[in-house]
């Protein structure tokens, strides 16, 4: 158990797991803008873009720390820990099996992870969340003719028949269920058929059941244990609205004493703590505010082994059940009652008494899954049922004619009733859990004897390729420990490429959900052929197994086949915790997954019994090879593909036959891959190769597949062929492959003549002498429909769908489309972007939808027949809109003394796509500002802007980096640090648009995600920044209020512009908003907002300065960049004035000059830029100035800071003398030379304690004093007539000299001394009951001391002792011990006062 678990913060990210709600609420038009879509994009660095964005969010929110999962390179774990600690990171936990660390780190330090060579990858410790149950629409059911049972779902996969025929029921197999926990005393999860205990292990890797029992007490008076202590208890994770993070709420509870009666602890010491209701109402009293006393005792003298929980909150343990650790004693107790008992266990107890962990299933999901895997009731009637109904499809409709509102607990028989369960809680009672908890649970199960790990959890994100942390863990644990992972595909279907993580793991058996036939209620009308009858009638919707509409479809983003198989997952009846009621129906791939876990248990059970060799690869292969292909709907002719079902419905008897057939043979291993450049998503992949072809947006003509055979013969003959005619291998038929040698198979994809649609096929590589197919390459291509002038840029479909069947429509959205509009005549549909992510979660109903600025590429519209009657019909329409205005730059040139305030400009509106009947809305004028900025690799550029009231649109764009191939990301935050918009594409050309932003201050942030020179070294790039704020202030009027245009038609419009006579010259922004009447009425979305730019009299400059930092007193070259603000082209021959010097820009619009900063922290450089036809610009640049690296020897050593080239200044000599005793006067005399009448600046460092600093000399123009962390700096400006002599005098206390090394050692030692003393006193203060206000004050000084000490650690690279001579350590070490001393003094005083009262 990780005792540090309660310090972890989670990033709250919604992830899929079980079953989604598929419907948008009625009455709300669905509208989406692709500008506001969060992108999680590719990375080839340690820090992913997701982590970078989270770090930036934390910085903007003022969050001090964030928590990451970091994977280290093999054998580099300790080195990585050392390097991370040098950054000031805290190692919260470690997983040595997977070389992973859980790390708390300051967000501003995250970028430095990219430069630690021992690290591989960093991920967020994301929060995983189960989804709510599916709710069907318009489906009614009749009363059941038979009591509900699981047998139909186990029968359809041949599990019951397999057990009856072969006798292997899962005995000897352990299945770990990673979920919300399992009811430890459920009647169907109590024993196996041969009487063995069903649940053999119960572990909790969440924080839910954790109790801090580090408090020990020994004073017992008449059976009463004296506590008299105030406890601070972390009561649970709660969303902090200000930071957006899940954080623990710490509550204070005082306990005076508890009754223990005759309960004894062998060593006389009792450990005590409080169990809070973190996520579950344990006593069902309507709140989660209770704290349950917990008592640990050492019953034998061999360590703490027994726990008591005061479940009735009477502070009396004598009426409670003693619990030993479950996997030792198998003790179970009842916490409380609801519909039935809430059973719980002691999952873990620390032998030293420091903590205890309790377990229960407060959600129900885990118990349902466990029942499906291995539920068993000794009174079950499975065999009677099987003999009565086996082989009759109609029985399923009778069985599934349930009434959801009147379910009674009946027999539950799991797929593998003889298997034993390892209950691993990784999700809390609220259905949430952290990614680290899940990985820890996976590791524990793999290393503690699990044969199968069943994971009905997961979530989706763009571009999942199996490189996320959970998937990496799945693959590594499979390789290292031979455990079989069975994982849910997810419930975000039926769009393609939507399988979630960790289901995308290569080694996982990923499971989709099938639906067995059920009875449904359908309103019968004349249209269905019943002229005399109306109303709901019940009959089977279909008679063969289908794929559940919600099941996530493949392929994986790199083309790999996912899911691998399907199993029943719709309306599954299984066990639920007894407190809920014992059993019920649930749907989802979460329910399908345990069916396959049970099948794997059956196969392994038989293999163990018969001595058949197996491993995870073999089990996966025989499952796939034995699966039953599901054809689809015979009435509509709709068919399923590998994307829907993988290899088909699991069939345990067929897989068993194959497993036996290959026993004793050596199967050849065949692998394949192709370069990722063939993929549409190459730039987003975290891997270098693809495992299949997923041609979503473009189809390669030829792909070169690399094939490699490894086996027990030098050569082997394989048959290579394609399952579809459009896949044409250049080599087909028999091919002889050489062992351990790559063979390149060229394949042509002949798509000419294919109708629009989705095409899926495989390339088979098969040794016909074996009972399995050795290898296969999945190929998925999309042939989209096109918007054309002939179809008025409108596509329509009228479809007939069978129940649980899916219709896919793909269409291409070209570049430059303003709005994508979609609608249906009746049934719901899904809309998916070209990257595979849904636009609206999850289904759209009859309300029209609009997507502004849609992502270019091939979109998918998909709809399903749900569980409705055969041949349901619906029509769909999609349309694109796009308009352009020419010219889009308008010029107004006023003449001298012109009094005119009205100006007219003609422009053309051209309708590019679908016909429009539109209203024109002019908006303007507004501001237009352009500048040239800079950002370094991994750094952030931040600029504040103020958005005024009445702003109709805020548009920000960046681009044109000086370093080619830079990847810059653009973010916009509000004044509270909330992310408003982002563009995170893998380029430097980014744009965000916010319509009608709230007035206030915003921050523009540009992240230099990857800025590398041609050699791959980190560097700095400049970029253009344009900020436009368009205000609706009535400056623009049009001569037309509305227009009607067909495709490619134009109209001339006159804009009448009103400006004041004294309106400043420059560049301004405006918008012509075009509202198609139908689209706007349906969705409240304009079909276009065309930006226009108005230039009044003169243009503006856009200027930038690079670099943006410097060191005090150190001269360096700076470059001023001058561009045209509108075109962003360089402006040559512009006059630039900096100080007293004048320059001309070169052909690149740049001026390079030398400058040395003379102010610490921030210095200013003011420039004036002039040119004809441009407004004169005066701008002051702020540069960040750091203190120079300085030692004691550098004190009083002057440096030449700044001079003009003409001055040619040099320091001729320096003399220093001092006099006096304790208070010493120091004189520094400097002689410098330079060109007459020119100026120069010098910097003289003096000791930090110097006082009464004076500067004298005939030619001193001015001087100033800057105080740094290590010294003071005298900045002196002189003007030359001849060699100039400058004198600096100051006084300083010169008492007994103590070296820097000694002072640092004293600070270090005193801090550690006081820190140790603080820990002792704080514990004593808690025991004595010191008030919370005093404790909090002491803690604040203690934490401040810790921060200063960590700063010293950071400066010394984690080794203070070796750096004691470093002057930089002096301030933080001094502050560390001073603050720790204050904390100690506060506690000493409080304790003294309380003890004095006694």
Swiss-Prot record:
Glycan-linked positions: 152, 222, 228, 240, 257, 262, 298, 327, 406, 651, 663, 739, 792, 893, 908, 917, 929, 1048, 1056, 1084, 1117, 1133, 1140, 1148, 1208, 1233, 1237, 1332
Residues in Peptidase S8 domain copies: 154-656
Catalytic residues identified in the record: 179, 365, 590
Leader peptide range in chain numbering: 1-26
Residues that make up the propeptide removed upon maturation: 27-149
Biophysicochemical property: temperature dependence: Thermostable. Highly active at 95 degrees Celsius.
InterPro entries in alphabetical order: Peptidase_C_arc/bac, Peptidase_S8/S53_dom, Peptidase_S8/S53_dom_sf, Peptidase_S8_Asp-AS, Peptidase_S8_His-AS, Peptidase_S8_Ser-AS, Peptidase_S8_subtilisin-like, Peptidase_S8_subtilisin-rel
UniProt PTM comment: LWM pyrolysin seems to be produced by autoproteolytic activation of HMW pyrolysin.
Top-level taxon: Archaea
Subcellular location: Cell envelope
Enzyme Commission identifier(s): 3.4.21.-
Keywords, sorted A to Z: Glycoprotein, Hydrolase, Protease, Serine protease, Signal, Zymogen
GO function terms (MF aspect): serine-type endopeptidase activity
Family: Belongs to the peptidase S8 family.
Name by which UniProt lists this protein: Pyrolysin
Organism expressing this protein natively: Pyrococcus furiosus (strain ATCC 43587 / DSM 3638 / JCM 8422 / Vc1)
UniProt lineage: Archaea, Methanobacteriati, Methanobacteriota, Thermococci, Thermococcales
